[in-house]
Amino acid sequence: MEKLARKQVQELTPYLSARRIGGTGDVWLNANESPFNNEYKTDFARLNRYSECQPKALISAYAAYAGVKPEQTLTSRGADEGIELLVRAFCEPGQDAILYCPPTYGMYAISAETIGVERKTVPLTSDWQLDLAGIESNLDNVKLVFVCSPNNPTGNLVKREDIVSLLEMTKDRAIVVMDEAYIDFCPEASTVDLLAQYPNLAILRTLSKAFALAGLRCGFTLANEELINVLLKVIAPYPVPVPVAEIAVQALSEAGLARAKFQVLDLNANRAYLQVGLSMIPGLQVFEGWGNYLLVKFPDGDALFKAAWDTGIILRNSPIENCVRISVGNRDECEKTLGFIRNYYS
């Protein structure tokens, strides 16, 4: 049956999520999930009815949290669907292109490749920042420029002045899509305030990370009202199930926000603990991280990754040579991981 598939799909290499890769163990630090398992109440009495396309309570709650108007907010099945909607809505297959800066999140490329949209890449500089000159020279036919900050997998923040320069550079030419999936761990670095000045800015958000709701699949796109209305033309009729909307609204309540803030503080402290401990091991390079993960360069990254895997510590291998990404778990998970790595190099 594969021969009946579209040519692009036949040639497509799927994104290998942490769950697809699998593994067995008791320390799971491979998917940048939160270690907190919070409880919520759900009303199952309305499951015979379809959900609203854009549940008003959810849109209002997230808009208030993000500091934007409800008209500037769209909710979807995770930020991944937001990526797909942007590509489908703004890119003509065989004509337009997206641009992204590796090493970075893999779904930008997959979403474009799936529908036959060209992918242009301008690698990050040696310190993981934007190569603005390289981007400018590759903007022909580009409709979307994806920038992840904090960047996955490197963990760094993209310089704000470079983001502003990029927005100026792409005015009336392309949309800059800021992927802020991890911004709740460093909210002061958000670009949400730039929405008022730049109509060519879109921002992706999620409840998967800081809100500990990876299994819920609830994300958001923030942009000007005109851009949001374009996305509403191509979104599925019922993208957010009733239980998802109900749980998300609880997470965005006053009590839910207070809990998320406390848990972010806890995870940031664990990240600092892990960063300091790893930095003291000779031969390791620990890159500064602003999300709930750290990128670490080992003398022999593949061997370290496999050894950890074999002992039940599941980390995330990286396409960057000898680098492994380590999610920040609870203190016990961080201690076990740090202890294993110390012993491995002792």
Curated annotation (Swiss-Prot):
The gene is hisC. It holds the Pfam family Aminotran_1_2. The keyword Amino-acid biosynthesis applies. InterPro entries: Aminotrans_II_pyridoxalP_BS, Aminotransferase_I/II_large, HisP_aminotrans, PyrdxlP-dep_Trfase, PyrdxlP-dep_Trfase_major, PyrdxlP-dep_Trfase_small. It catalyses: L-histidinol phosphate + 2-oxoglutarate = 3-(imidazol-4-yl)-2-oxopropyl phosphate + L-glutamate. One of its GO terms (biological process) is L-histidine biosynthetic process. GO terms for molecular function: histidinol-phosphate transaminase activity; pyridoxal phosphate binding. It comes from the Bacteria. Belongs to the class-II pyridoxal-phosphate-dependent aminotransferase family. Histidinol-phosphate aminotransferase subfamily. Its EC number is 2.6.1.9. The keyword Ion transport does not apply. This is Histidinol-phosphate aminotransferase. Keywords: Amino-acid biosynthesis, Aminotransferase, Histidine biosynthesis, Pyridoxal phosphate, Transferase. The modification N6-(pyridoxal phosphate)lysine is found at K209. Pathway: Amino-acid biosynthesis; L-histidine biosynthesis; L-histidine from 5-phospho-alpha-D-ribose 1-diphosphate: step 7/9. NCBIfam families: hisC. Its cofactor is pyridoxal 5'-phosphate. Homodimer.
